From Swiss-Prot:
Keywords: Cytoplasm, Ribosome biogenesis, rRNA processing, S-adenosyl-L-methionine, Transferase
Binding positions for S-adenosyl-L-methionine per the UniProt entry: T17, I62, L84, Y99, S103
Pfam family, one: Fer4_RLI
A GO-annotated cellular component: cytoplasm
Compartments (UniProt record): Cytoplasm
InterPro entries: RNaseL-inhib-like_metal-bd_dom (IPR007209), Tsr3-like (IPR022968), Tsr3_C (IPR007177)
EC numbers for this chain: 2.5.1.157
The protein's name in its UniProt record: 16S rRNA aminocarboxypropyltransferase
The protein's enzyme class: transferase
Coiled coil: none
Major site of localization recorded for this protein: cytoplasm
Species: Saccharolobus islandicus (strain M.16.27)
UniProt keyword annotation of Transferase present: yes
GO molecular function: 18S rRNA aminocarboxypropyltransferase activity; S-adenosyl-L-methionine binding
Length: 166
């Protein structure tokens, strides 16, 4: 399974998990999207139906800053764009905030949802807080794991409605 990173150099280099993956040779730096493109603005939600894409072509993470990102950074990247369902950041910068995942967290979530848990756990060892993300989202990740897009959207909708009722 290949992991690619498109780095827009908008993040603090010391906190950039995409660059860390490249530095550790766990990902390859690229300018071209390949396979699944993790895109928080995508209308399509990642699901088990995307596993063949992961196996054949890999996954591309677009590494940018949440503080100044826009759809334009994702729009021109070729590939199969997918967004992740609701999950909560376990990283120290955005801890507990829905959808604001680091590149590494997005990768771990993708692998977990696509039933590649051993790989997800392997990547969680890259940073001190990697296991925090998995533990914080364990119930959600298990609910999404191995599900098709419609099932995941239904689960996500129920979770959001539950949060809004509180």
């Amino acid at each position: 399974m290949k992991v690619y990173v498109i780095d827009y150099h908008k993040d603090d280099p010391k906190k950039c998990t995409g660059r860390k993956l490249v530095k550790l040779k766990l990902a390859e730096l690229t300018r071209v999207g390949r396979g699944i493109i993790l895109n928080p603005f995508s209308e399509r939600t990642l699901s088990i139906n995307d596993k063949d894409i992961l196996i054949k072509s890999g996954i591309t993470i677009i590494d940018t800053s949440w503080n100044n990102t826009s759809q334009n950074e994702f729009k021109n990247v070729r590939g199969e764009h997918r967004r992740l369902p609701i999950l909560f950041a376990g990283n120290p910068i955005h801890y507990g905030i829905a959808y604001k995942l680091s590149s590494l967290e997005a990768l771990m979530a993708t692998l977990y949802i696509l039933d590649e848990m051993k790989e997800a756990i392997k990547f969680s060892n890259v940073v001190k807080w990697g296991h925090t993300f998995i533990e914080l989202n364990k119930e959600l990740l298990e609910a999404y794991r191995n599900k098709d897009e419609e099932e995941i959207k239904k689960i996500e909708k129920e979770i959001i409605e539950k949060i809004l009722r509180k």
